[in-house]
């Protein structure tokens, strides 16, 4: 149901996630294979039969004025708040056009999303929802600065300076990070869906269109193809997408901001999809030679085709290029870090030891994003994470509801020196993104993983023997269960290849991460 609430122009407006959105001047028709094929099943539309539970006194509070734009189910207007004269945007949705239950669900979901994100500085502010016998009214902040797309096109060469681009990208990443903490994936990040609050050059950017957005349960994936062709991530086309797809889209936008061209282009949508799946962005053409290495590194790490190796929104906010001029307090807790902390307790003892060894080989520059995450969780800034701070951090990943006993179990697994606290070294071992380390710098991965291996391989013969494993871990009793997990060829010892495989893959006991008990079904 997303509508761009611009007092200048409305592009890509749509009242239904199941319908095509209006074409924009710089993008092909957004795709949505969820389009319903059901026939109308009754003389009274579902919308007319539904009480949405919203207030019934819209006209007592607002006077509708100038038309801004329209979608499939209704129109968007400027309206005046009667008590104080404030100008707002009102989307008026026609109940008679909500024929099927899915259309009603879409309206309710959009309101739910706007309420969930209410208060975020880079999301259009939700004021209220009303209804009467004929319409649903969604009242929001009015943005009068125009679309991000229009500002791009107004720039010389259709591109931003690096400094200005970083400011814009930082705001989009903050929106994505906030969405992901709420168990929400935007699914249609593109310049047309961001508006400026005002025409001022330093106006804040606002995300306005959540028409394709959806809640997702932890560990689950979307299996449909939605979004806009130029910005769609490879995993969306493979029908296995999640929050990572939003970061890919922001990577595409960043590429456009910096050079004025799309990274993946063809004359047809099928051609675009093939480009997305097969090719890498071109950094050899003008003006990339004049763009900083830091900016190029940032874009490349967002446009990694493997979603496991792609930066998360929170990690991207820690990157030197986008962080310059920003504050550490802008960086939200990273859902992938929280997931890694939850998973660490499920890993075998051997994998926990291996990850600790790998973490000890990394320098500060390689784990700067994890330093930001540690500092965000360490509320009292005493250099360690307490049980209460761990509980507060894990609670920020809203779809999960962990019992205190489970939080204590997680902290105990991470706390290798058993002092009841998690220091930074222990935190890195549990929070590390191994796939990213391998993808972003394969040579460094080879060196780091070998160095970790050699912490076990005391005689440097190229294998970890049972006795070396026992000496490193300090474990008593049979070492066979640990050895068996990594010893793929069953020769009674662990090679470097087998050790790297252990680092890359979750242990056998944790390959199926369960959805949290008591997960709130937000749909």
Curated annotation (Swiss-Prot):
GO terms for biological process: defense response; negative regulation of defense response to bacterium; protein phosphorylation; regulation of secondary shoot formation. Ca(2+) 3 binds at residues 457, 459, 461, 463, 468. It comes from the Eukaryota. It is an enzyme of class 2 (transferase). Residues 328-358 are annotated as: Autoinhibitory domain. Belongs to the protein kinase superfamily. Ser/Thr protein kinase family. CDPK subfamily. May play a role in signal transduction pathways that involve calcium as a second messenger. Acts as a developmentally controlled regulator for coordinated stem elongation and vascular development. Acts as a key component which contributes to the developmental switch that establishes the transition from vegetative to reproductive growth. Involved in pathogen-associated molecular pattern (PAMP)-triggered immunity (PTI) signaling. Interacts with and phosphorylates the kinase BIK1, a central rate-limiting kinase in PTI signaling. This is Calcium-dependent protein kinase 28. It comes from Arabidopsis thaliana (Mouse-ear cress). The gene is CPK28.
């Amino acid at each position: 149901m997303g509508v761009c609430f611009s007092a200048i122009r409305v592009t890509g407006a749509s009242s239904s996630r199941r319908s095509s959105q209006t074409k924009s001047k710089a993008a092909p028709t957004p795709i949505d294979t969820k389009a319903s094929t059901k026939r109308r099943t009754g003389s009274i539309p579902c919308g007319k039969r539904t009480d949405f539970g919203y207030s019934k006194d819209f006209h007592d509070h607002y006077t509708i004025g100038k038309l801004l734009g329209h979608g499939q189910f209704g129109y968007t207007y400027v309206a005046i708040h009667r008590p104080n004269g404030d100008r707002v945007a009102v989307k008026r949705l026609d109940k008679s056009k909500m024929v099927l239950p899915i259309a009603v669900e879409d309206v309710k979901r959009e309101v739910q999303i706007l309420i969930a994100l209410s208060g975020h500085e880079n999301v259009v502010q939700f004021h209220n929802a009303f209804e009467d016998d004929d319409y649903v009214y969604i009242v929001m902040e009015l943005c009068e600065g125009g679309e991000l797309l229009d500002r791009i096109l107004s720039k010389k060469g259709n591109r931003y300076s690096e400094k200005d681009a970083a400011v814009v990208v930082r705001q989009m990443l903050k929106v994505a990070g906030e969405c992901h903490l709420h168990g929400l994936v935007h699914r249609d990040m593109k310049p047309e869906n961001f508006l400026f609050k005002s025409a001022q050059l330093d106006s804040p950017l606002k995300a306005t269109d959540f028409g394709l957005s959806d809640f997702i349960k932890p560990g689950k994936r979307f299996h449909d193809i939605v979004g806009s062709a130029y910005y769609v991530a490879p995993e969306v086309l493979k029908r296995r997408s999640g929050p990572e797809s939003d970061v890919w889209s922001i990577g595409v936008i960043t590429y456009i901001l910096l050079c004025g061209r799309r990274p993946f282009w063809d004359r047809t949508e099928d051609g675009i999809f093939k480009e997305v799946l097969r090719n890498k962005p071109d950094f050899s053409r003008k003006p990339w030679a004049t763009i900083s290495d830091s900016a190029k590194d940032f874009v490349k790490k967002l446009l990694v085709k493997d979603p496991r190796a792609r930066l998360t929104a929170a990690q991207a906010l820690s990157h030197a290029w986008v962080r310059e001029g920003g504050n550490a307090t802008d960086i939200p807790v990273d859902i992938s870090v929280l997931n890694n902390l939850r998973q660490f307790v499920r890993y075998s003892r051997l994998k926990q030891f291996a990850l600790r060894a790998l973490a000890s080989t990394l320098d500060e520059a390689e784990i700067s994003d994890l330093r930001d995450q540690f500092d965000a969780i360490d509320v009292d800034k005493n250099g360690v994470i307490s049980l209460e701070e761990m509980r507060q951090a894990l609670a920020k990943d809203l779809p999960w509801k962990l019992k205190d006993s489970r939080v204590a179990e997680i902290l105990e697994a991470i706390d290798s020196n058993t002092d009841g606290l998690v220091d930074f070294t222990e935190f890195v071992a549990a929070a590390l993104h191994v796939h990213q380390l391998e993808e972003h710098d394969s040579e460094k991965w080879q060196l780091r993983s070998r160095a970790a291996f050699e912490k076990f391989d005391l005689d440097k013969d190229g294998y970890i023997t049972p006795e070396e494993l026992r000496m490193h871990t300090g474990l008593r009793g049979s070492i066979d269960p640990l050895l068996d997990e990594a010893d793929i060829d069953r020769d009674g010892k662990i090679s470097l290849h087998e050790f790297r495989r252990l680092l890359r893959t979750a242990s056998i006991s944790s390959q199926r991460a369960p959805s949290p008990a008591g997960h709130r079904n937000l749909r």
